């Protein structure tokens, strides 16, 4: 029986909205403080975003934005924004094992896949299980001229959790790793910071110094019911929580 397609962008990391790593801190912002690049994209969506209504509600969105993150930029984000690091690390590990059984995620404290039922169908594990051999190949070959690409998703695939990421590309330039990702749709409050952390964890498994991670955001958006919460976050409210839109 076909599974109902549900977009991953709001659902992917509901734990992010309720959990933060004990090692993460929130940096309050003042007129003199420079926002990290993730918070800058939130500010840009608030300031310049257009309005649209879809089946899940009203959003403020921007098209074809780009985040280019150096190791220093990543550190700024991880130190200045709460991320459920342990759970996201466990989740990526299960993805890369190709684990489709939702119960296995519950066993490590991850319950945001429960709505999918017992099995993840043509979702992240289906594609991320290709990552370990790809990483091994990169580490073995280390070819500057080779583009190593992991494709995610298929337009017509039957799924109960469509990946937001469409591809992740690994390139080597002057002995340094350059990671590029294309994200077809990105919930800026819930999915985006978690995707940034997942990409960082992938990069750490490659035996090369990281030069940059670039995210190409085809559609990055904030749901209307999270706009005020986003403003509070940017004002330094460390207790802000975001609504899940499904």
Regions found by a protein language model. Give the residues of each.
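Targeting/processing segments of secretory and organellar proteins
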Residues: 1-3, 10
């Amino acid at each position: 029986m076909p599974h109902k397609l549900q977009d991953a962008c709001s659902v992917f990391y509901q734990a992010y909205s309720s959990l933060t790593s004990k090692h993460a801190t929130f940096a309050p912002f003042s007129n003199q403080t420079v926002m990290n690049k993730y918070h800058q994209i939130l500010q840009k969506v608030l300031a310049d975003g257009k309005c649209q209504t879809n089946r899940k509600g009203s959003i403020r969105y921007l098209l074809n934005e780009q985040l280019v993150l150096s190791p220093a930029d990543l550190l700024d984000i991880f130190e200045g924004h709460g991320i459920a690091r342990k759970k996201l690390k466990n989740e990526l590990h299960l993805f890369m094992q190709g684990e489709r059984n939702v119960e296995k995620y519950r066993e490590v404290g991850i319950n945001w896949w429960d709505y999918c039922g017992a099995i993840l169908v043509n979702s992240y594990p289906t594609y991320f299980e290709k990552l370990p051999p790809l990483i091994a190949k990169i580490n073995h070959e280390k070819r500057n001229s080779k583009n190593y690409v992991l494709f995610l998703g298929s337009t017509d695939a039957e799924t109960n959790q469509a990946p937001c990421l469409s591809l992740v590309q690994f390139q080597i330039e002057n002995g340094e790793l350059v990671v590029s990702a294309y994200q077809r749709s990105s919930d800026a409050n819930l999915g985006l910071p978690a995707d940034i952390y997942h990409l960082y964890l992938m990069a750490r498994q490659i035996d090369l110094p990281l030069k940059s991670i670039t995210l190409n955001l085809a559609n990055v958006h904030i749901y209307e019911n999270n706009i005020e919460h986003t403003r509070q976050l940017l004002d330094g409210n460390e207790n802000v929580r975001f609504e899940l839109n499904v």
